[in-house]
Amino acid sequence: MQQLKLNNGVEIPILGYGVYTITDDKECERCVINAIETGYNHIDTAAIYMNEPAVGRAIKNCGKRREDLFITSKLWVQDQGYDMAKKAIDESLKRLGVDYLDLYLIHEPMGDIYGQWRAMEEAYRQGKIRAIGVSNMYADRLCDFLYHVDIKPVINQVRTNPYFQHIDTFEFEKENNICLLYTSPSP
């Protein structure tokens, strides 16, 4: 599958399989294994989806080596600040049964996102996360964010479709070498 090189050198598959609405554990595990068998190697989950354990079992049982998969998860808003974010990162790793995540995102830019980001930068430096980014952050907020962090986000995952094009955000990201990751293409 074709890949894109992020601003830190990590390569991400251009297509990913998201498990947002798959809440039944057995169904989630089966769907992820089926997705991997059909050629997806990027699996996108999040703490709030409450299916990280099922995704972890699928990773373990899919027959592929961990390094051949690209796993994304996200930090939810209840994990405000540095300490809560550090704990949440470790809990996601444990639930998924992996030693590292390929990509970890702030799911919603609310509350103490700077404390969350510091914890993510630390986990990145420790090798627990290969790439860090944000989600649902639009141009004005992203511009301010870049002035207050040490490591620039590699990705901004934003709901995008013909009705929500976010041209200003796309242009800002292009100028700042931040990849726009589209999600939820339906209106």
Where do the model's predicted regions map?
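N-terminal binding-site loop/beta-alpha segment at the start of enzyme catalytic domains
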Residues: M1-L69
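Acidic/glycine-enriched edge-of-secondary-structure segments
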Residues: I14, I43-A46, S73-Q80, R130
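Conserved, mostly hydrophobic/aromatic
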Residues: Y17, I43, V55, I71, ...
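Conserved small/polar residues in nucleotide/adenosyl-binding loops
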Residues: Y182-P187
